[in-house]
């Protein structure tokens, strides 16, 4: 287990797995095909880069629901090919994220409510749910209030690339939600946005 905890070794007491000063966790568990631990106790509040953090983790479905990701700017490929991941991360503060490219690409099981995510700074949603074989949750633009703060969830006004966002070329995606309020005025790339979706 990699839980943050107080330990005493050789008469010295310290906090094991204190990651509170870490800023970059890019690729930390990439290709760790058997890794499946609970990491919910980790203080990741200073992390800015989670690129490919759980990339190609075949069985990972550890609890990370309480993570403070408010400073993270890159979630590029964070769960790419994380085949079994399906934790409730709907309460994550994603307001600083600019890159969600491939974030849930090729996730077989992921199907959680992300309806209150703040995507106002995201510029790339390219392949975000490509071949995500289970995802079918409401992600329309709407006013929400979370923790006393009111904001626009799924604000896509800064997104420039939505290429293959729901493409289901090898694993037809079931996504079939209303997204009629999305602001696509700055999007310059939309090729294969809904290609091979099984229900849309």
Region spans (language model):
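Negatively charged
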Residues: 1-200
């Amino acid at each position: 287990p990699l839980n943050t905890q107080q330990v005493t070794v050789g008469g010295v007491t310290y906090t094991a797995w204190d990651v509170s000063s870490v800023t970059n966790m890019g690729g930390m568990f990439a290709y760790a095909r058997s890794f499946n631990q609970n990491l919910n106790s980790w203080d990741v509040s200073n992390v800015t880069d989670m690129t490919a953090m759980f990339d190609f983790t075949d069985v990972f479905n550890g609890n990370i629901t309480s993570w403070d990701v408010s400073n993270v700017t890159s979630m590029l490929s964070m769960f790419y090919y994380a085949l079994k991941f399906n934790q409730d991360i709907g309460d994550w503060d994603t307001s600083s994220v600019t890159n969600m490219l491939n974030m849930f690409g090729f996730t077989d099981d992921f199907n959680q409510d992300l309806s209150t995510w703040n995507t106002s700074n995201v510029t790339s949603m390219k392949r975000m749910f490509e071949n995500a074989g289970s995802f079918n949750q409401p992600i329309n633009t709407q006013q929400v209030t979370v923790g006393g703060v009111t904001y626009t969830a799924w604000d896509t006004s800064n997104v420039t690339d939505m290429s293959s966002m729901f493409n289901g070329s090898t694993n037809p995606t079931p996504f079939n939600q209303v997204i009629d309020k999305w602001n696509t005025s700055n999007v310059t790339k939309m090729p294969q946005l809904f290609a091979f979706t099984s229900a849309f």
